Structures are given as structure tokens and as C-alpha cells.
């Protein structure tokens, strides 16, 4: 990819990822080193309590972080990840996952992320 990143390019990357496409996310913003996407709240993504399952949230941010890192033109794969669940993602239309590259690199890229609900909380 070039320095000019489009939503369409990032959406195409997302849809080419067989696992990532299962999440049915929609890229809403994209620029070099930063991607924002909406993850729909679907019954199939919930845990026994009706909240979004933590594994689904982790998978969503892992996928979006990979796309954000990939905007620099490198093939990427996750080597390490950490997430802290501060609040349950309760029934809402969608949650927003925002990934921002903190330190780009050819061999290792560091990406931070944030998850919010439709009200900007979580």
C-alpha cells in the first residue's frame, strides 16, 4: 500500500482474511497506521450472559491491529497480544475497534487499540 490508505483497501484486506471475514466488521476510517471498524453485536458472538464474548473482542482487535500495521506495506502476523477487559460489552448495535500503530517497523510493529460501544463507552 502507498501512504494514501483508503477505507476500501482496508475493507478488501479484511474480507480476504477468511477468519476475519467471519466477524462481519465494517471499516469506517482508514489512514496510514490507523484503522477504525465496527463489529456488529450478533447473538452468535455472545457469551452465556448475553454480552459480547471476550474471544470475539480479542479476535476483532487482533484483526484490526493487523490491518493497521499492514498499512505500512508489510505482511504482518501477531507475535504477542494483551487485552484488559474493563467492562462488559452489553447489547448494543455494534462496538467500535480502533487500532493505531505506536511504532512501525519492518520486523516488529507495535499497535495499540481501543474498544468502545455505540455510546463511546467501555
Task: Give the label of every model feature segment.
Residues 1-122:
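Terminal targeting signals and extreme-terminal segments of soluble enzymes
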Amino acid at each position: 500500500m502507498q501512504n494514501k490508505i483508503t477505507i476500501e483497501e482496508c475493507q478488501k484486506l479484511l474480507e480476504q482474511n477468511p477468519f476475519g471475514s467471519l466477524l462481519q466488521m465494517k471499516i469506517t476510517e482508514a489512514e496510514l497506521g490507523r484503522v477504525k471498524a465496527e463489529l456488529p453485536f450478533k447473538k452468535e458472538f455472545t457469551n452465556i450472559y448475553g454480552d459480547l464474548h471476550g474471544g470475539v473482542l480479542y479476535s476483532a482487535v487482533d484483526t484490526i491491529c493487523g490491518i493497521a500495521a499492514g498499512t505500512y506495506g508489510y505482511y504482518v502476523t501477531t507475535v504477542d497480544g494483551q487485552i484488559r477487559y474493563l467492562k462488559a460489552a452489553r447489547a448494543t448495535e455494534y462496538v467500535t475497534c480502533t487500532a493505531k500503530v505506536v511504532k512501525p517497523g519492518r520486523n516488529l510493529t507495535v499497535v495499540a487499540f481501543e474498544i468502545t460501544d455505540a455510546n463511546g463507552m467501555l
